[in-house]
C-alpha cells in the first residue's frame, strides 16, 4: 500500500480545538493544539473531567461562536493558552413572567 503525504497549508489564522466537559453540562475548553492541556491548571482539569473532542475551529471570524466572544477567546488563548466557556445562567422564567405582568418579584415588597 502506498503512503500518501498531504502537505499542510500554512495560514496566518489562528485555530483552536474545542473539548466538551465530561462532568459539567454545556462547559467547553478551548486550546490551541489537539490534546495539549499543558497550559490548563490541574485543578481546572480535575473539575472539567475527561475532555471529549467537540470540534476544531478556525478563529478567523468566518464562523460565529455560540456562547463566546471571538476576541475574548483569541486573547485568552494567546495570554494563558486556554479559554473556558461556562454555560449561560439559567433562565428565571417566574421572574420574567412576573415582570411582564407588572408584579414586583422582591419577597420583601409582597
From Swiss-Prot:
Residues 14-98 form the YcgL domain. SUPFAM superfamilies: YcgL-like. It comes from the Bacteria. Gene3D superfamilies: YcgL domain. PROSITE patterns: YCGL (PS51648). Residues 97-110 have a biased composition (Polar residues). InterPro entries: YcgL-like_sf, YcgL_dom. Residues 88-110 are annotated as: Disordered. PANTHER family: PROTEIN YCGL (PTHR38109:SF1). HAMAP family: UPF0745 (MF_01866). This is Protein YcgL. It comes from Salmonella paratyphi A (strain AKU_12601).
Amino acid at each position: 500500500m502506498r503512503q500518501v503525504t498531504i502537505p499542510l497549508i500554512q495560514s496566518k489564522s489562528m485555530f483552536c480545538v474545542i473539548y466538551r466537559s465530561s462532568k459539567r453540562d454545556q462547559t467547553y475548553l478551548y486550546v490551541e493544539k489537539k490534546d495539549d492541556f499543558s497550559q490548563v491548571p490541574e485543578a481546572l482539569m480535575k473539575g472539567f473531567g475527561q475532555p471529549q473532542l467537540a470540534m476544531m475551529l478556525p478563529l478567523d471570524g468566518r464562523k460565529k461562536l455560540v456562547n463566546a466572544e471571538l476576541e475574548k477567546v483569541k486573547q485568552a488563548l494567546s495570554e494563558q493558552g486556554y479559554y473556558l466557556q461556562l454555560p449561560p445562567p439559567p433562565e428565571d422564567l417566574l421572574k420574567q413572567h412576573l415582570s411582564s405582568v407588572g408584579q414586583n418579584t422582591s419577597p420583601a415588597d409582597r
